[in-house]
UniProtKB/Swiss-Prot annotation:
Record keyword Aminoacyl-tRNA synthetase present: yes
Cofactors that this protein relies on: Zn(2+)
First-tier enzyme category under EC: ligase
Major localisation: cytoplasm
E.C. no: 6.1.1.7
SMART domains per the UniProt record, alphabetical: tRNA_SAD
Source organism: Borreliella afzelii (strain PKo) (Borrelia afzelii)
UniProt-listed GO biological process terms: alanyl-tRNA aminoacylation
The protein's name in its UniProt record: Alanine--tRNA ligase
Alphabetical list of SUPFAM superfamilies matching this protein: Class II aaRS and biotin synthetases (SSF55681), Putative anticodon-binding domain of alanyl-tRNA synthetase (AlaRS) (SSF101353), ThrRS/AlaRS common domain (SSF55186)
PANTHER family found in the cross-reference section: ALANINE--TRNA LIGASE, CYTOPLASMIC, ALANYL-TRNA SYNTHETASE
Keyword annotations from UniProtKB, A to Z: Aminoacyl-tRNA synthetase, ATP-binding, Cytoplasm, Ligase, Metal-binding, Nucleotide-binding, Protein biosynthesis, RNA-binding, tRNA-binding, Zinc
Cofactor comment text: Binds 1 zinc ion per subunit.
Record's subcellular location: Cytoplasm
Length: 594
């Protein structure tokens, strides 16, 4: 079994079960301010899980690119990944627990698909509490498929209940599926909750059955949904009998190239192996971010900062391997080779990716020089031979200077470092980052409010108004919406004049005053394009798409949600117009209630 074969088998299986294959979305979620990147397969489907009608139907399957940033500093072990793919299938009210479980069981055990013996399967279900009953329904389905009671674990909400995000909203029990790896039990009490590695979690089926209200009451949903997820890389490692995802075809071409560049052999020395794993993970994530349709570049903010950090961390660990020259662009071909059959954007943008990596690599070499100069300046003013932890952390956080390099310089110049002090500051930083990472993983559902919906509609008016004032070359490059404001990035090479800004505001406010209706249609993508519907440049779309028309003014391919009439918006006001990156301008705007 290979990475490509597993991906194809999953898609083909669910298509045979009448699921419609939808395209995976951009790594950067559209109009979701709570997240930097899509971190789970369900995130792009949140509006549909909440009740929006999906243009492709109510039984869906796809592969979603995901990127998690909360554990970047832990990457380097055998399991943590920054970029990964999530296989997922969904029912938006079409079926529920029984059919979901039976599909999962068939895919796992059928000789045509994964061919895992059913006597190696273990499952967990929700044990119930004073608010939600025990999930005997799912357990009985598993029993009917031949899973004995002693291999069905009833676990608490911490293990087998999803949501809600925040204090209220959709939620429900889940069933997790495990495979016995054949390893010896770590103790007499070893079970599926143990982290010893005997039981591998291969799949999770979430049953969105309840709505929790503001008073903490759980009410049965009329439209129950299923959301399942299987990590592609972890599953292929299990199927190939590997102890680590890095030993699979998802990483080995990159690792082989790093071996060639560094002269090190993977598997001979753990310190070197860790460096190789970090570089392999980070270069893959960086390539996918740069290839993404969202147009992210290395910077000191948001997604750009994550990209910059991945690149610079790769360079730091390459230095530990003895690589002293530019090398990142040399790894791009290996990443593209792994994914070319499924992600053609890596092939199409390969030269661009190499150029951006080389540019950022050169910048970091200059940063290292500047960091060393700052180190010398700081140590001249110290009254002792110990560098305080806050100073070492400042070099790391403000100047992007890795701690290990500070340590090397300290040794060279005859200084010690208050490492415990540095670790204290670093842990605070990590805690903050992890909170952000948790928010990224669980976010989305919390922010589909009336205020953000109004601002989303306003971005459509803004997009069209910009084209009318500046020209048809204006194309959306990204947006970010909070309950307070919208941020809209668009293609335009010059700073807007005050007169242009005023004209755009006037056009938008006129459409609001005219009380235009907002209508949704579902049509084939080709038809939408023939009608002149605007779409995100570089984004991949399914054959059937949702198109929102603002009565005679704007027509856009969009997943929603939107208000029903522009008269709901209030007064539109541009607060700031500035450069986002080369050739890209950014507008921040608000709606003022009248």
């Amino acid at each position: 079994m290979t990475l490509d074969k597993l991906r194809k088998k999953y898609i083909d299986f669910f298509k045979s079960k009448k699921h419609f294959e939808i395209m995976g979305k951009s790594l950067v979620p559209e109009n979701d301010p709570t997240v930097l990147f899509n971190t789970a397969g369900m995130q792009p489907l949140i509006p549909y899980l909440l009740g929006e009608v999906h243009p492709s139907g109510d039984m869906l399957v796809n592969v979603q690119k995901c990127l998690r940033t909360g554990d970047i500093d832990e990457v380097g072990d055998l399991s943590h990944l920054t970029f990964f793919e999530m296989l997922g299938n969904w029912s938006l009210g079409a079926y529920f627990k029984e059919y979901s479980v039976k599909c999962s069981f068939e895919f796992l055990t059928s000789s045509e698909y994964l061919n895992i013996p059913k006597d190696r399967l273990y499952v967990s279900v929700f044990e119930g509490d004073q608010e939600i009953p025990r999930d005997t329904e799912t357990a009985k389905v598993w029993e009917s498929l031949g899973i004995p009671k002693d291999r069905i674990y009833y676990l608490s909400k911490d293990h087998n209940f999803w949501g809600p995000v925040g204090s209220k909203g959709p939620c429900g029990p889940d069933t997790e599926i495990y495979v016995d790896t054949g390893k010896i039990k770590c103790s007499i009490n070893c079970n599926v909750t143990c982290s010893c590695g005997k039981y591998f979690e291969i799949w999770n089926n979430v049953f969105m059955q309840y709505n929790k209200d503001e008073n903490g009451n759980y009410m049965e949903l009329d439209r129950k949904c299923v959301d399942t997820g299987m990590g592609l890389e972890r599953t292929i490692a299990f199927l190939q009998g590997k102890s680590s995802v890095y030993d699979t075809d998802a990483f080995m071409p990159i690792i082989k190239r790093i071996e060639f560049i560094s002269g090190k052999i993977y598997g001979q020395k753990e310190d070197d192996d860790r460096c190789i794993r970090i570089i392999s993970d980070h270069i893959k994530a960086a390539c996918f971010i740069l290839a993404d349709s969202s147009g992210v570049f290395p910077s000191n903010l948001g997604q750009g900062y994550v990209l910059r950090r991945l690149i610079r961390r790769s360079i730091r660990y390459a230095k530990k391997l003895g690589i002293k020259s530019h090398f990142l662009a040399d790894l791009v071909d290996s990443v593209e080779t792994i994914y070319r059959s499924f992600y053609n954007e890596l092939t199409e943008k390969k030269d661009f990716i190499k150029k951006e990596l080389s540019t950022e690599e050169e910048k970091f070499f200059k940063t290292l020089f500047q960091g060393e100069q700052e180190f010398i300046k700081i140590t001249r003013n110290l009254s002792s031979k110990t560098i305080p932890g806050d100073i070492a952390f400042k070099l790391y956080d403000t100047y992007g200077f890795p701690y290990e390099l500070t340590e090397e310089l300290a040794f060279e110049y005859g200084f010690d470092i208050d490492k415990s002090g540095f670790n204290e500051y670093f842990k605070k930083h990590q805690k903050t980052s992890k909170k952000g990472g948790d928010k990224v993983f669980k976010g989305g559902l919390a922010d589909y409010t009336y205020e953000t919906t109004k601002l989303h509609t306003a971005t459509h008016l803004l997009h069209k108004a910009l084209q009318l004032v500046l020209g048809d070359h204006v194309k959306q490059k990204g947006s970010n919406i909070t309950a307070e404001r919208l941020r809209f990035d668009f293609v335009h090479s010059k700073k807007m004049t005050d007169d242009e800004i005023k004209k755009v505001e006037d056009i938008v406010n006129l459409q609001i005053k005219n009380s235009l209706s907002v209508k949704k249609s579902i049509m084939e993508l080709s038809e939408a394009r023939e009608k002149g519907a605007m779409a995100l440049f570089g984004e991949k779309y399914d054959n059937l798409v949702s198109v929102y028309e603002i009565d005679g003014f704007s027509l856009e391919v969009c997943g929603g949600p939107h208000v029903e009439n522009t008269n709901e918006l209030g007064t539109f006001k541009i607060q700031k117009e500035q450069s986002s990156s080369s050739g890209i301008r950014r507008i921040k705007a608000i709606l003022i209630d009248e």
